[in-house]
Amino acid sequence: MRCSRRVLDRVFTGLVPVALGVLLSGCSSVSYYGQLAEGQWQLLRARQPLDRVIESPATSPVLRQRLLFAEKARAFASAQLKLPDNGSYRVYADLGRPYVVWNVFATPELSLQPVTHCFPIAGCVAYRGYYRQGAARGAAALMRQEGLDVYVGGVEAYSTLGWFDDPILSTMAGWGDERLATVIFHELAHQRVYVQDDTEFNESFASFVEQEGTRQWRAARGLAAIDEVGARQREQFTRLVLASRERL
């Protein structure tokens, strides 16, 4: 039986102090892990069932239509693409800000090899995420003082890899219907298969599921496939960038 969001919230509340105690026992990054826990908790508390938001008189017509479309794409993802059939993307959260998190990326000066950071669930990734833009900029400034090249980028969506029921976020609501569907496919693919410490494989797998899922989703609605020439050009550009990185 699928756990309710209320149960997951209680579990999260109980586990956070224990998890933080373990994580911080030999680590000085108390504030960083604290803001991660607080930010995720606030996001979970903001969730509402899609049906409730769709039926609410306070919901704008544009948002209502977008969520109705998302409902259909979400059902297709599990029924036809065999992606996880759970509560993710069947709830909505209004965050009141343009991005859900801001990621800080860093490389040694004149290098294309990213500095990685390791976490218990996600494994090692090439960024650190912050729920407040000011905190991200502050962390970036400290990294620059260490001689690193740094970039701060806003993120409109992310996946908890099935640990919680991920919502459709207000940060995603401005997207076109097609992009919203592809992101649902992409993020659910991460829940289906995720290999720790292998960002390249994880993104390649999720991107493949996204592209194939989009093709099938469009075909099911009687729409033509997305321009294959454009897709090939994007793939060629990606290979060129990766080859350039190897040479450098």
Listing of model-derived features with the role each one plays in the protein:
Residues 25-26:
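C-terminal motif of bacterial Sec signal peptides marking the signal peptidase cleavage site
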Residues 29:
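Short, conserved catalytic or interaction motifs in soluble domains
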Residues 32-62:
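Post-signal peptide N-terminal segment of mature Sec-exported envelope proteins
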Residues 63-75, 241, 245:
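Short amphipathic alpha-helical coiled-coil/interface segments
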Residues 73-234:
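Acidic/His-rich structured neighborhood in mature extracellular/periplasmic domains
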